[in-house]
Amino acid sequence: MKQTSLALAITALLSTLPSALVQANEGCAPLTGKESGMDIGRSSTERCLPGANPLQDQQWYLLNSGQDGFSARGGIAGNDLNLWWAHRTGVLGQGVNVAVVDDGLAIAHPDLADNVRPGSKNVVTGSDDPTPTDPDTAHGTSVSGIIAAVDNAIGTKGIAPRAQLQGFNLLDDNSQQLQKDWLYALGDSNASRDNRVFNQSYGMSVVDPRSANSLDQSQLDRLFEQQTLKAQGAAYIKAAGNGFNKIAAGGYVLNRTGNGPKLPFENSNLDPSNSNFWNLVVSALNADGVRSSYSSVGSNIFLSATGGEYGTDTPAMVTTDLPGCDMGYNRTDDPSTNRLHGNSQLDASCDYNGVMNGTSSATPSTSGAMALLMSAYPDLSVRDLRDLLARSATRVDAKHQPVMVSYTSSTGKVRDVKGLEGWERNAAGMWFSPTYGFGLIDVNKALELAANHQPLPPLVQLPWQKINVTGSAAAIADVGNSPTSSTTRIATPLTVEAVQVMVSLDHQRLPDLLIELVSPAGTRSILLSPFNSLVGQSLDQQQLGFVRTKGLRDMRMLSNKFYGESAQGTWRLEVTDVANGTRQVSLLNRETRERTTLTERNNRQPGKLISWSLRVLGHDANRS
């Protein structure tokens, strides 16, 4: 059964709102959603944003006109979430509850208070007020403003300015981060269960591989599955990570030195929670319409969203801050060159900041966009909403090219292989990039597609299919002439929504490895790019406190690249060792500021592929 037409959905929404709630600048009047033939794209002559909020004109993520966000220069017009038509037609996130699981939420902030609903929790004190007392704990408050700052002519405007917020301060420095508190905040409590969006602007950086089979991770996976698949289910939005160039781990900041291929140091698949199908993982885009310099990437990326840069040379995100000039990112003594900061005339109370960034900003950008879609189409499943966002996304940075890795094999043959793909089209016609996922969110287009959307058939989760690899077929040659490969066959006629892989192998220098999955249609997806942050084997265990590992043990990775393809047929895993030279990693001690250099020496013996497992999630191909 088709959904109600968009015009009817918007008319119904407008009928519930007092006209004063849609504040309009002169020349940006409300629309009915019934206007015939209107261009609702990023270059439309009708493009404008309602609202009289004094900082709104610098919120490029709402409507990018090339403004500078109080930095040295502006971005390129049009690189935004394209939500102006949604706002002009009254789609504002009404009726949608959003949980911000972060370091806190200033619930009395003048630009947030009217959108904060009961049910927040301070896991440190046990109270229902997660307002931070530490002046450096402003992250969650800034995240909240991006999602749902009130359209009240005070400061900024949220992406979904009528959505309702709860805050849970799991990331507070004094939080013990107990599993029971994570479960409580993420939907396993009466207080949080009715949230339709869970914003997770956090992640994990690792130097040694982590298994996704821990009890804690398994509990969260089951909870996310239950909450996602229920009627009017919940969307879990997750940050990809900020480790493209460097990571923080074990008291150190690590980055690779030298002039090697421009590959991510932190592949987003290295965080076990990022290979969870139920998490919609997001990379960050800047105001110029390309990957934010810090953003982690990988085959698990579903979408890209606005995250910005650092707010000095080029725009970050203008949003709410802890109130007061002695709290948060914006303080009287703030050394930032962002013009909003330091007791500026525009923000004399220092209640806002112009330096919020990271995939921590791309995540609430996505949460806000999801809230807008849920507001207009409350009965669509989360899987349907994900499908709409994927099919409507914009292929930004269209000339984005693959990163090539060249090496000389053990027999003297020069091999050129892809270390990371650019934009590629899969066998189902879907464009995908591990940098941008399916592309930049386009709210207006997603709403337009929703009017005639056919709901997806029920989700089918095939059981894990394990393949043991033995004998000579298991050997991973040092800079081999060809990859080590293993195959398995799926007989079920399934249309793919995502594919998960778990890999176990032995190898003495894991960052040498390129791991790829090839579908029955021949589409290739790089699950793990080489020269990554898995440098724990090379670290001095006693000096730095890292634990050595023999290799990967059931390390889970996810790919969205096969979306819409047929699962039926032969799947192939390929593992290639692409390097044998000596490399170096720089380590900065975060406490002493002492810098040392780590030498990564080549493996002394070939690696070994022990086993791998495959799971496909999708729906009945005969009902697509």
UniProtKB/Swiss-Prot annotation:
One of its GO terms (biological process) is protein processing. It is an enzyme of class 3 (hydrolase). The active site is at 102 (charge relay system), 139 (charge relay system), 360 (charge relay system). Residues 59-421 form the Peptidase S8 domain. Folding, maturation and production of the active form of the protease by the cell requires a protein (ORF2), encoded just downstream of asp, which acts as a chaperone. Formation of a complex with ORF2 in the periplasm also inactivates the protease activity and likely protects ASP from intrinsic proteases. In vitro, protease activity is inhibited by human alpha-2-macroglobulin, suggesting that this inhibitor can impede ASP virulence activities in A.sobria infection sites. However, slow ASP inhibition by alpha-2-macroglobulin in plasma may indicate insufficient ASP control in vivo. Disruption phenotype: Disruption mutant releases negligible serine protease activity and does not affect plasma clotting. Keywords: Calcium, Disulfide bond, Hydrolase, Metal-binding, Periplasm, Protease, Secreted, Serine protease, Signal, Virulence. It comes from the Bacteria. Residues 456-622 form the P/Homo B domain. Belongs to the peptidase S8 family. Furin subfamily. Ca(2+) 1 binds at residues 53, 111, 150, 152, 154, 156. It holds the Pfam family Peptidase_S8. Its EC number is 3.4.21.121. It catalyses: Cleavage of -Lys-Lys-|-Xaa and -Lys-Arg-|-Xaa bonds. This is Aeromonas extracellular serine protease. GO terms for cellular component: cytoplasm; endomembrane system; extracellular region; intracellular membrane-bounded organelle; membrane; periplasmic space. Ca(2+) 2 binds at residues 321-322, 324, 327, 330, 350. Binds 3 calcium ions per subunit. Disulfide bonds join 28-48, 325-350. GO terms for molecular function: metal ion binding; serine-type endopeptidase activity. Optimum pH is 7.5. It is found in: Periplasm; Secreted. Exhibits serine protease activity. Preferentially cleaves the peptide bond following two basic residues, one of which is Lys, but does not recognize the bond following a single basic residue. Probable potent virulence factor that cleaves various host plasma proteins, including prekallikrein, prothrombin and fibrinogen. ASP induces vascular leakage and reduction in blood pressure by activating the host plasma kallikrein/kinin system. Ca(2+) 3 binds at residues 478, 512, 577, 579, 602-603.
